[in-house]
């Protein structure tokens, strides 16, 4: 069995991973949409109606794996193909790099069992346990933030019911029990995981039953919560990755991730870093039209802290896309990022990707007036609802779009 070529369309996720969201939907990853599949009997599996074993051994999953082994591009994976076709690094590419070590072990074993019912269970599980969150970030949705759900419903942007995001504790306990012998990586996302008593309870269970010593735990957090109990629990895991969702420094992040306080987040990052020797700590920044003028400040902060920062381009919602900005703002952002000193790029790997994308938008500039109007309307409506003003948080951006 040969290892897939680096430049192929192969993705490791259907061979080793499961993703479960707060509504109970289960897929190989968070970007995959099975309803967009060309498979004749496509369906969305849900742990409220089935179990992870049935989904993992389903004919659909065998079909998906088979497509990747034939070097095809499954239509349900369009989000990754879109990114790659525009020169961006996709989740597929990152996942293949992250799991390269298992290509010769679990990948080969599961390859031999394609079409059979005894595929080894996933060893990488990502769970969005609930949408319970203490912030309402600009790029988020009600599916991932209970606070933003309330705001979006009030503004008429969504029609979701909070009860749809309340899975039973027993559902997750059942899943972890089923994966007890295979699970190596557990990724917990939000809402805000550390704001959620259910997550703390889950971590306690993993520590008490001894699984924590065998698990690499990944938690994505907004950095607003840190206490001694959480630190004590996290110390028990074999390996730990804490990813802080930060979109700027100071007032910029407070606007992007409202109603956070920067001094609290900065202090918590330091506290986690100093008290968790088993942790790899990094920052994930959602690059969008609201914060692109301030990325150089974030680079300076992460460099001072000696923390790696990864930049992820926001595609949805489309009113936050970089292409919606006036040309003068794109040019300002390009000049600022291009002038960042090499010493401030020691702890990142994809700034040049963002710089190149800005240049492409400038060189092929074609502003959609309707999208720009929607961008301004969204800012004004959210600011009015939150009783804040953009110019008090990000004056450079406010002045730039005003001119």
What does each model-found stretch correspond to?
Residues 17-23, 239-243, 263-402:
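Conserved C-terminal portion of the radical SAM core fold
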Residues 1-21, 25-31, 36-163, 179-180, ...:
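N-terminal pre-core extensions flanking Radical SAM catalytic domains
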